[in-house]
UniProtKB/Swiss-Prot annotation:
Subcellular location: Cytoplasm
SS bond partners: none
Enzyme Commission code(s) on record: 3.1.11.6
Source lineage: Bacteria, Bacillati, Bacillota, Bacilli, Lactobacillales
GO CC aspect terms: cytosol; exodeoxyribonuclease VII complex
Keywords, sorted A to Z: Cytoplasm, Exonuclease, Hydrolase, Nuclease
Similarity comment text for this entry: Belongs to the XseB family.
Protein name per its UniProtKB record: Exodeoxyribonuclease 7 small subunit
Source organism of the structure: Lactobacillus helveticus (strain DPC 4571)
NCBIfam families xrefs: PRK00977.1-2 (NF002138), xseB (TIGR01280)
Reaction equation(s) it catalyzes: Exonucleolytic cleavage in either 5'- to 3'- or 3'- to 5'-direction to yield nucleoside 5'-phosphates
Quaternary structure (record): Heterooligomer composed of large and small subunits.
Length: 80
C-alpha cells in the first residue's frame, strides 16, 4: 500500500496495477472496492503532486517566457 513517502513513479505504478486488476475483472467484489478506494486515494495524491509541479514551473517561467533560477533551499519559490 503506497504511503506519502513513495515517490511519484512508485505511486503511478501502483495505480496502474490497480487499474489493470480492476479491468481484468478477476477480483472479488469486496477486494475490487478496496482497490478502487486505494486507487482513488493514490490518484488524488498524484494530482496534488502534479499541481505542485505545475505551480513550480509556472513560477520559474513568467508569462513572457522569462526563465528564473530555482532556489535550491526553497523549491517552491524562484530566485529573482
Amino acid at each position: 500500500m503506497p504511503t506519502k513517502k513513495n515517490n511519484f513513479e512508485e505511486q503511478l505504478n501502483s495505480l496502474e496495477k490497480i487499474v489493470t486488476n480492476l479491468e481484468n475483472g478477476n477480483v472479488p467484489l469486496e477486494d475490487a472496492l478496496k482497490e478502487f478506494q486505494e486507487g482513488v486515494k493514490i490518484s488524488r495524491e498524484l494530482d496534488k503532486k502534479l499541481t505542485s509541479a505545475e505551480e513550480i514551473v509556472a513560477k520559474l517561467i513568467d508569462s513572457d517566457g522569462t526563465e528564473h533560477k530555482l532556489d535550491p533551499n526553497n523549491a517552491a519559490a524562484p530566485e529573482d
